[in-house]
Amino acid sequence: MPPPRSSAAPTLAELRRLTESAGGSAGAAGPDAAPTLPFGVAGLDAALPGGGLALGALHQIHEGGPRGRYAATAVLFAGGILARLDGPVLWCLHSRDLFAPALARVGLHPDRVVYCETWRDAEVLPAMEEGLRHRGLAGVVGELTRMALTPSRRLQLAAEGSGVTALVVHRLCAGEAAEPEPSAARTRWRVAPAPPEGIDRRMDRRLGRPRWRLELQRCRGGAPGGWIVEACDAQGRLAIPAVLADRPAAPERVLRRAVR
């Protein structure tokens, strides 16, 4: 859950001061083309216009499984993206299950995060829109169960106007269909843990980072696709898993086989 408030933690009253020091007050973005944030995974970046995730735009991230089971994976994917951007982050949520130390493990330090706690989706959306007016933010995250087309258009326009990236992490409710509604988001992602293939599960956990099944379901001007990637590291970076089956056996293993 979000850390308890203390004198050291940023408050909403300090948000304007933080954003002004990071990049100025709210206002329209310049006429230059929107920058992108490459993931560093060749096939993934090739599917995205400009070779990376468009900044100053709205993106949707869905948990790829039954309600609540993979919500943490979607949150960590969002955290890894924002970890590689400069400035504070406004995180709008209406449930208290966000685990701040987990965000730190993907590179997003809790000191960078300003939490906006609400009671329902209807309060998350205006909080996000307000945050997107502040150009010094690295990004604005909103945890929502549903988002209709009209609110998504408002968020997309606000992101375009300020150049601040907006991420909506969808949290499924009981009885809700997993199929997403139409929206104005630039991309729509679905992320879930990927079970290991061809090796023992316990060995897979010892050999490196967890694996995710990452799907780009919709991309304006790009190509949908799916990838198995290693989860974000301490700098928020994804990676392609090593192909263990193609590695030569270790010398000790070869020697043991020869003795037998």
Feature map (PLM): residue ranges:
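Hydrophobic/aromatic beta-strand patches that form the interior of the parallel beta-sheet core
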Residues: 59, 90, 114-116, 167, ...
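Glycine-rich, charge-decorated loop segments at or immediately adjacent to ligand/cofactor-binding or catalytic sites
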Residues: 99-103, 174-192
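Conserved nucleotide-cofactor-binding alpha/beta core module
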Residues: 88-143, 149-153, 157-162, 171-172
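Short, structured patches in soluble enzyme cores that scaffold and shape functional sites
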Residues: 143-145, 168-171, 193, 218
